[in-house]
Swiss-Prot record:
Parts of the chain that traverse the membrane: 14-34, 63-83, 104-124, 131-151, 156-176, 191-211, 247-267, 285-305, 343-363, 368-388
Chain segments annotated as coiled-coil in the UniProt record: none
Role of this protein: Part of the accessory SecA2/SecY2 system specifically required for export of possible cell wall proteins. The central subunit of a protein translocation channel.
InterPro entries, alphabetized: SecY/SEC61-alpha, SecY2, SecY_dom_sf
Subunit organization: Component of the accessory SecA2/SecY2 protein translocase complex required to export cell wall proteins. May form heterotrimers with SecE and SecG subunits.
Gene3D superfamilies assigned: SecY subunit domain (1.10.3370.10)
Subcellular location: Cell membrane
Bilayer topology: Multi-pass membrane protein
Chain's gene name: secY2
Protein name: Accessory Sec system protein translocase subunit SecY2
Species per Swiss-Prot/TrEMBL record: Streptococcus mitis (strain B6)
Keywords: Cell membrane, Membrane, Protein transport, Translocation, Transmembrane, Transmembrane helix, Transport
Length: 405
């Protein structure tokens, strides 16, 4: 028993459970002075925004202080990553502290947009001042977002899984109810349900293969015995981005939806804005095509976030390692980036077929939206499980060795 509680993995796991308790408790604290009986408060985007909020740690269904979730922070990370590729801006050359501060400023800007859009749409109880309630709820939602960011940082440093655990718990708590409600709304024949169950098993098998498949690049390491050279290699995943593209595309595409809601309150009589907002509504052809395109784009971007050729080549050069037949430095960087690009396209096509293809059914019936999102949800869920599993496995590695004496 003493050995179990002295384990680093167990200690970190218990700390993560404590943080999850705080998260679940906070997600049950509702915003004040709001009529909870009104469910369709965000117009036609309610179902999608509630679903996407659940994927990012939010809870629009119960209108809690965590309703917006980690979506502003995740969207800020995407934008920052895109901006950092521009050498003219020089964002990556600044100090880490300055970069973190600017990321938080960007998170604050997006949090203000989303929180204000939600607060203006909330059904306020008639006995209270609408302006004061909107202001107070906006501040509470922004504070809730930054509290979740802080909670994620705590879990990353002292627990297991970082922000992934919060997102995972939000999915487990909220998504099953969305799926059940969809089955109750859309009457699907039993045969189709059985077929979907079989396809789910096949998809899960393919997903496991894509996540565990590796392309091995032989690497020569200084001081390594010839007997072990066949075990020395650089691993590149068949789908380098994993389930991150789906997770971030849901967060990223929710920002325009919130922005259109906010602009609709500011310019209520603007015909052009109303027409554009209607065309970009969830389930419309424009939104579906943008969703599929961004999903493919993010599959490539996050592949390079996961495996950066410049960083790997620089690390190998400093440690005296090299890939057989490739010169160290820029040649190694170009070689690795070429492989990552090739596999990111393969992963992007897999993501588009599995997570983007079902979205085409939404063009025929918008009620199928949440069902069409399930394959992407499986990809995201699988990636999270594998990430946490690998982290726990790494923490327990030292405990597998027995003392010499």
């Amino acid at each position: 028993m003493t050995k179990i509680y002295s384990s680093i993995a167990v200690k970190k796991g218990l700390y993560t459970l404590f943080l999850l308790f705080i998260y679940v408790l906070g997600s049950r604290i509702t915003l004040p002075f709001v009529d909870l009986n009104s469910k369709d408060f965000l117009g036609g985007s309610t179902a999608y925004l509630a679903f996407s909020a659940a994927l990012t740690g939010g809870n629009l269904r119960s209108l809690s202080i965590f309703s917006v979730g980690l979506s502003p922070w995740m969207s800020a990370m995407i934008l920052w990553q895109m901006f950092s590729y521009s050498k003219k801006l020089g964002l990556s050359s600044t100090a880490i502290e300055i970069q973190d501060r600017r990321k938080m400023y960007l998170t604050l800007l997006i949090a203000v947009i989303q929180s204000l859009a939600v607060s203006l749409s909330l059904p306020v109880q008639s006995s209270y001042s609408a302006i004061l309630v909107v202001l107070m709820n906006t501040l509470l939602l922004i504070a809730g977002t930054f509290f979740l960011v802080w909670l994620s940082d705590l879990n990353a440093s002292m627990g297991i899984g970082g922000s992934i655990v919060i997102l995972l718990s939000s999915i487990v708590l909220n998504i099953p109810q969305d799926v059940i409600e969809t089955f109750q709304t859309v009457h699907i024949p039993t045969g189709i349900i059985v077929l979907l169950a079989l396809l789910t098993l096949v998809f899960s098998y393919l997903l496991a293969i894509m996540y565990r498949a590796r392309y091995l690049v032989p690497v020569n390491k200084i001081g390594l015995h010839n007997r072990f050279k066949r075990y020395s290699y650089l691993e590149i995943m068949l789908n380098p981005a994993g389930g991150m593209p789906y997770m971030y595309v849901m967060s990223f595409l929710s920002v325009p939806a919130y922005l259109f809601i906010l602009l609709g309150f500011i310019f209520p009589n603007h015909a052009g804005l109303a027409a554009l907002s209607k065309e970009f509504m969830v389930g419309k052809p424009l939104w579906v095509y943008v969703y599929i395109s961004v999903l493919f784009l993010f599959s490539i971007i996050f592949a390079f976030v996961t495996m950066n050729g410049e960083e790997i080549a620089d690390r190998m050069k400093k440690s005296g390692e090299y890939i057989y037949g490739i010169y160290p430095g820029e040649d190694t960087s170009r070689f690795i980036n070429g492989l990552v690009l090739r596999f990111s396209v393969i992963g992007g096509l897999f993501n588009v077929i599995m997570a983007g293809g079902p979205m085409l059914f939404v063009l025929f019936d918008e009620k199928l939206l949440r069902l069409a999102m399930i394959p992407g949800l499986f990809m995201m869920f699988g990636g999270m499980i594998f990430t946490i599993r690998d982290e726990v496995k790494a923490l327990r590695l030292n405990e597998t060795y027995k003392p010499l004496i």
